[in-house]
Amino acid sequence: MNKFKTKIAVLAISFLSFAGIQSASAIEGLTIGAALNYSGFGGTGTETKDVAGTDEIVSEHGVFDADYASLFVEYAFSDAFSLGIERHLDDITTPTNTNTKNQSDNTVKATFENHTTLYANINMPFNTYFKLGVIAVDVATQENLNTGGSYNNVDTTGLTVGLGYNLTMDNGVFVRAEISGSDYDDVSATNQSPDGNAQEVKVTDMIGVTAAIKVGKSF
């Protein structure tokens, strides 16, 4: 995963450096902007606990929504194709899941941090465009367990596809409306509690649907 993030960073720096070549004409094709996003997320969580050599398995599907801001920068290599990188400004935190056992509440939630997307926009007729990208995100767990244990933080990757409409003014200022869907790789975290009983949590079938309004300027 760290190698994947490094590759994204290298690609991002490479195309931004290319866009920033020391000549005024190099600014042409550069786009910067901000977005307001509203997303719905879903996934299936499965907890497996090893109790005296016997697995206790609990599985549950959940959904939640979130709104957040993001910034993006793009470079147009032609009238039809541009490459961009987008970074969430806000972390996304799941609702807290509470499980009462032995008259004690166990609470677990997760926060998606450093959500970064490297993407390509392909322009189509009637001011529309098709978006295809790859995602890298960190998943930090926050738990309060009666065993005193804790889960490790993890990270994951994903793919996103979307469609958008772009309206550009004469001065290069633009407004976009975009809808996209994302699919994330499965993740798992392990908790070795002081009582010696190992627990594993897997989150599978993670998906997201996002509607966004974007504003910016193209040079």
Question: Across the structure, where does each feature detected by a protein language model lie?
Answer:
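Hydrophobic alpha-helical segments, especially transmembrane helices
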Residues: 6-8, 132, 177
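Predominantly the C-terminal beta-signal and adjacent terminal strand-loop region
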Residues: 55-57, 90-95, 159, 167-219
